[in-house]
Amino acid sequence: MPKFYCDYCDTYLTHDSPSVRKTHCSGRKHKENVKDYYQKWMEEQAQSLIDKTTAAFQQGKIPPTPFSAPPPGGAMIPPPPSIPGPPRPGMMPAPHMGGPPMMPMMGPPPPGMMPVGPAPGMRPPMGGHMPMMPGPPMMRPPSRPMMVPTRPGMTRPDR
């Protein structure tokens, strides 16, 4: 009877049947071996790419990046518009420049104060309602009369 060999685990299974292979492949040790195998393979691929890039750069096949040396003749390359900086000649300053600064990030509220809005990274509650004012919650009237326990046979406890 042929045996099944697992390359990841470097072992033979008792026999070659789908149920034995399925049981083996769902095992903890097999999964760890597969993960380790591919992790080592990725590290080897990354190191190979680094080595090839380094060799090509040293041979002069890859030119140095344009930002690695100062521009010739004092020429200045303007930064992309997405990078904030001082306004360039002939440009209007952005609305946030020259005016009052935006509200800075604040730390946690003092004890007893409730923050307004959801915590950073949190979604608002399901209804989308946000608290209006910090402080204790407001009581709202019940939507229907409160249920008063009654004794069997009594329809109205106040009569």
From Swiss-Prot:
GO terms for biological process: mRNA 5'-splice site recognition; spliceosomal snRNP assembly. It comes from the Eukaryota. Coiled coil: none annotated. Residues 63-92 have a biased composition (Pro residues). Signal peptide: none annotated. The keyword rRNA-binding does not apply. InterPro entries: Matrin/U1-C_Znf_C2H2 (IPR000690), Matrin/U1-like-C_Znf_C2H2 (IPR003604), U1-CZ_Znf_C2H2 (IPR013085), U1_snRNP-C (IPR017340), Znf_C2H2_sf (IPR036236). Keywords: Metal-binding, Nucleus, Ribonucleoprotein, RNA-binding, Zinc, Zinc-finger. Residues 62-94, 140-159 are annotated as: Disordered. It is found in: Nucleus. SMART domains: ZnF_U1. A zinc finger (Matrin-type) spans 4-36. Pfam families: zf-U1. GO terms for cellular component: Cajal body; commitment complex; U1 snRNP; U2-type prespliceosome. GO terms for molecular function: mRNA binding; pre-mRNA 5'-splice site binding; protein homodimerization activity; single-stranded RNA binding; U1 snRNA binding; zinc ion binding. Component of the spliceosomal U1 snRNP, which is essential for recognition of the pre-mRNA 5' splice-site and the subsequent assembly of the spliceosome. SNRPC/U1-C is directly involved in initial 5' splice-site recognition for both constitutive and regulated alternative splicing. The interaction with the 5' splice-site seems to precede base-pairing between the pre-mRNA and the U1 snRNA. Stimulates commitment or early (E) complex formation by stabilizing the base pairing of the 5' end of the U1 snRNA and the 5' splice-site region. Belongs to the U1 small nuclear ribonucleoprotein C family. Component of the U1 snRNP. The U1 snRNP is composed of the U1 snRNA and the 7 core Sm proteins SNRPB, SNRPD1, SNRPD2, SNRPD3, SNRPE, SNRPF and SNRPG that assemble in a heptameric protein ring on the Sm site of the small nuclear RNA to form the core snRNP, and at least 3 U1 snRNP-specific proteins SNRNP70/U1-70K, SNRPA/U1-A and SNRPC/U1-C. SNRPC/U1-C interacts with U1 snRNA and the 5' splice-site region of the pre-mRNA. This is U1 small nuclear ribonucleoprotein C. It comes from Gallus gallus.
